[in-house]
Amino acid sequence: MKKILSFISIVFMVGLFLYVNADDELLKELESYLPQESVETTEGDQELIDIEYDINKHPDNYVLLNDGKMKLDKSDKHRLDKRGTETAWVNYKGLDQLGRGQDVQALLTCELVFKQSSKVTERPDFSSSVGVAGQYKDGRLDRVKETWRGEESNNTELHLPNHNGYLYNKSHTLAWSLGGSMETENVTLGTRRQNVGSNDADGGGMGYPETTIRNQFYNEIGLNDMTKAEAQSMTPEQACEKSNTKVYYDVDPVYQDDELVPRGTHVRAYSINDDGETINMNLWVFNTQPYVDINYADGTFTVNQ
């Protein structure tokens, strides 16, 4: 018995020595193999998940909440007090313990949106290193690089009555056109329908709030009437001289417990410069695709047409 205890003590001491002397990258790699605590859905998020999707009622994959209006709550006000209300900022939370993209808050200004407009900056492609939760059948979370790795993709091209193309997109939480990054922390696995709805000109799915906000800034400065050369000859400050709009933007991918793919995204937007007169939005965007049953636990799916 004493020999067993001595052996256990030696193993423990060696393990402790290795842990204390390991570098951060090794620790992250080791921690990725440890069992994670379970995550439970909050009551408020469950209410959103429980909203039934009906393509006839929600042809563009979103439903308005509270008549489409929001109010700044205590956490919103605290964040604005802390981060400021004049200069643009973005708050990313990184990946959670399960490797999933989390909510993003931002103060959107004309300067931020102008800099990433297509007339000024061409949107880059996603790096091959950007992998998202649910993307792979054999997915593994790389805690060192904060991304997902895998060989067998869950994504495939489908031919459905309302869609011909790949089922999934790497879906921005904060759109590139609104100042978002192309990194894993700003991306979830979203259906094409979640991204653009029915491809309506006014924007569907996540495109609806994104288009509404983007057009507000573009219209204020006449960006749509500028040539690329004209836009690129101006600094953001010069281009946005006549714009006073400041939009508080809060986007929250919502998951059911430990699932890797969000059931949908809660989007809130509020123009703080005029108490929500210009922009006031509150909606739930369904992460669904008609004729497809998605296994949100791992991103696999079956076609049911």
Predicted regions span which residues?
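Glycine-rich short-loop/terminal segments
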Residues: 58-59, 63-137
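Short amphipathic alpha-helical "recognition" segments used for binding
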Residues: 6-7, 106
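Hydrophobic membrane-insertion alpha-helices, especially the h-region
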Residues: 7-19
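N-terminal, intrinsically disordered, polar/charged segments of Gram-positive cell-envelope systems
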Residues: 24-79, 83-86
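Domain-level detector of nuclease and nuclease-like folds
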Residues: 101-305
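Alpha-helical structural elements
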Residues: 14, 28, 48, 57, ...
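Positively charged n-region of N-terminal signal peptides that target proteins for export
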Residues: 1-4
